[in-house]
Amino acid sequence: MTVIIQQSKTYLTTKIRLSQEGCSVSIKHFFLDGNTSKGYVTLVKNIVKTINKVYTLKGSLGNEKNKIFKRISGNFEQQDLEIYWLHNPSDENMLDGIVIPDKGIAVIDGSARNGIEAKYSNFIERIFDLDEALDKTQLVINKNSIIQMQEEIEQLHEGAYAKFAKGKEIHEQKEELYISAMDFDKANKVTAKLAANLFHDVIVAKENPIVEQLFFGAATPNGAVNYIDSITSDIKKRYIIKGRSGSGKSTVMRKIAKYAENVGLAVQQFPCGLDPNSLDMIIIPSLSVAIIDGTAPHVIDPTRPGDEVIDMFELCMDQSIETKYDQRFEDLHVAYKQEMKEGTRLLQEAKQVRESLEQIYQEAVDSTIFTEKINEIIADITA
């Protein structure tokens, strides 16, 4: 079968639709930001680059913003449109925004952490400030408590990032040992074979391919959470790459992604939630193909007819390395798990403090003004 590629400028819409009229509403789940070993990392720039209309909701009322995101989502769901929910890595039950690809619309939390307003204010359609509905007198009464809680939340997050950074350092020690057993010629052959299978009958129809980025998973107060199954729900072919640390999984993805770009295909890249400089998944929507790192903490095993496992440890490594360094690997594994556990605990504490802070803001809401504000926001965005 020859594939002729036609790309869309609309965010994450260059994909094969498996159903047409009468399709059921689809909500896909992603993370826009991450609690990583590099600190708080946001991919909000990708939204600004690829979406025509970006709205932001700013303000201190996280729970209320979450409700508004879901109300706007519900409006577009009634139109049988696909919606992307962008979850908050510090509380995955809360949203940082939504995207409606077919409308070219995004509604994003305008918090200071993702920097969307500070960096991209000229490209924002409209900014809505929910703090306009707060009784400032009530907030002044609680000023010291608010400032103390804000500082505590920041310190707890910084502590978590330090733990994740230490975990990454330990992980890199494992990588170094495994890399010593790596046969790079074999790894290159695996990549070349995969590229040949994917691209041998592609006819390039457009230059300047679109490259998009989001996180499929994140370190959260509940541990590592991923939405791989949601994101790949309509993908026909999934290559699940297994292997040890340092077995070249991310390198394979980067090379395949580059092959795709070179022949004019759009690519969706999903950085690692711990190390955002590494890739954990790519999707080539026009081919309905995903290549996934199927190892912990996001273990993916073949469950669908189109799933295929590529085991880099079996194909490209001297497996005696594990016998040689058996105890060392075990010690590193235990140390890594401990750092990640501590980082998760700190995120849990930060979430608890944030919930207390949220309660203070909630008690300062002028319900009449707030209701008017919500109606204004929803009417403007869904018009």
What role is predicted for each listed range?
Residues 77-134, 261-337:
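Conserved nucleotide-sensing/catalytic segment adjacent to the nucleotide-binding pocket
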Residues 121, 125-161:
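Internal, well-ordered alpha/beta segment that forms a basic, Gly-enriched binding/recognition surface
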Residues 49-85, 108:
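N-terminal ordered "arm"
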Residues 22-42, 201-229:
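N-terminal pre-Walker A segment at the start of P-loop NTPase domains
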Residues 145-197, 328-331, 335-377:
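An accessory alpha-helical subdomain
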Residues 1-23:
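N-terminal amphipathic/basic-hydrophobic helices that include classical n-h-c signal peptides
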Residues 55-72, 237-257:
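Glycine-rich phosphate-binding P-loop
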Residues 46-51, 229-236:
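Phosphate-binding P-loop
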